[in-house]
């Protein structure tokens, strides 16, 4: 009878923890936005990484037309 509870995995964390450890890992994959907002569909990439490049190109492209 003592083996049954252990085999159930309810008292033991190995079986239960192993299955619960997988879900948290999936959350980490969705939480990468904070890790690297560069490839975030939230627009974070356009806020820091994309912002600098476009801003420089925009400033250089704008001056030419006004000059004419």
From Swiss-Prot:
This is Negative regulator of P-body association. Interacts with mRNA decapping proteins DCP1A, DCP2 and EDC4. InterPro entries: NoBody (IPR047852). GO terms for cellular component: P-body. CDD domains: NoBody (cd20243). Transmembrane segments: none annotated. One of its GO terms (biological process) is negative regulation of cytoplasmic mRNA processing body assembly. The record marks 30, 34 as: Required for interaction with EDC4. Signal peptide: none annotated. Residues 1-68 are annotated as: Disordered. It is found in: Cytoplasm, P-body. Promotes dispersal of P-body components and is likely to play a role in the mRNA decapping process. Its main location: cytoplasm. The keyword Cytoplasm applies. Changing residue 39 to A: No effect on interaction with EDC4. It comes from Homo sapiens (Human). Changing residue 33 to A: No effect on interaction with EDC4. Keywords: Cytoplasm, mRNA processing. The keyword Cytoplasm applies. Pfam families: NoBody (PF21949).
């Amino acid at each position: 009878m003592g083996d049954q509870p252990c085999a159930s995995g309810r008292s033991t964390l190995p079986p239960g923890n192993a299955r619960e450890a997988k879900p948290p890992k999936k959350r980490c994959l969705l939480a990468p936005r904070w890790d690297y907002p560069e490839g975030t569909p939230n627009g974070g990439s356009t806020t820091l990484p994309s912002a600098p490049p476009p801003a420089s190109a925009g400033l250089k492209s704008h001056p030419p037309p006004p000059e004419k």
